[in-house]
Amino acid sequence: MMKKAMIIVTLVAGLFVAGCSSSESKEFEVSFDGSVDHVHGMGYAGSDKGLYFATHTGLKIYRDGEWLETTKNLNDYMGFNAVDEGFYTSGHPGEDSDLPNPIGIQRSFDGGKTLESVKFEGETDFHGMAVGYKSHDIFLMNPGQNSELEQGFYKSTDDGKSWKSVGAQGLEGELFALSIHPSDSKLVAAATTAGVYLSKDGGESFQLLTDAAQGTAVFFNEESLYYASYNSGPSLVKYTIKNGEQEELLLPDLTEDGPVYIAQNPQDNQQFAIYTTKGQAFLSNDNMKSWEQILVDGKVK
């Protein structure tokens, strides 16, 4: 009889813990029906199949056709990068945060519930930052001198413990976006007012890929670089790393607009997402053969 009672108590305790865990998860993410403004990064973070948008007021998530927002850590996220375990970010603390301003480089491996300082907390807000999806190597543009770095381009291959200055020779124009290959950190791409650039030596030198077009977005998967540019209209191109072939891809109808963020679902390589200058977001489930709009002028659908 005693043994049976102990089993019942154990089962009830287990159900209570599971219930608390489920409740905590639901409390952290709630349904969202508003506007997604001031987006400074987008991607599929960790093993979560949700598409994360880093905004002025925390994280907004599109998952299984539903929009969600987080209820804590409502920070002004900048330089957001999704990785295989979660995300890395920079920016400024929200009203509910006790983080110093700016927040330096932070990372989260639990969907944004908690943040861990990587480097430069209270010193620098990094807008131009790329993090390898698998390697977690960091490539960034430091906007001004801090306690360790001068102004310029740097990379870290040990999670921010040490930094190496890189030359970025040939890279011209005002920087809009950076991307680093998921696992091969010799490959770095940049989008600037002068075009889209590719480096094959870890950022020491860059070569121009575009002709008379402004670069707007860059994104790597293992095999390819996807980049967006704008001349008389928007363009989305797949650049195959192995042979340098370039393929023009289908974009939705965009009037005086173009992609500023590109993402691919690592759990479903047919699924891509883009976010545009005017606050439109589109999802493709067939490798960019067609697009479904999920944000209209920043308003969720």
Question: Language-model segments: what does each one mean?
Answer:
Residues S21-S23:
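Bacterial signal peptide processing site
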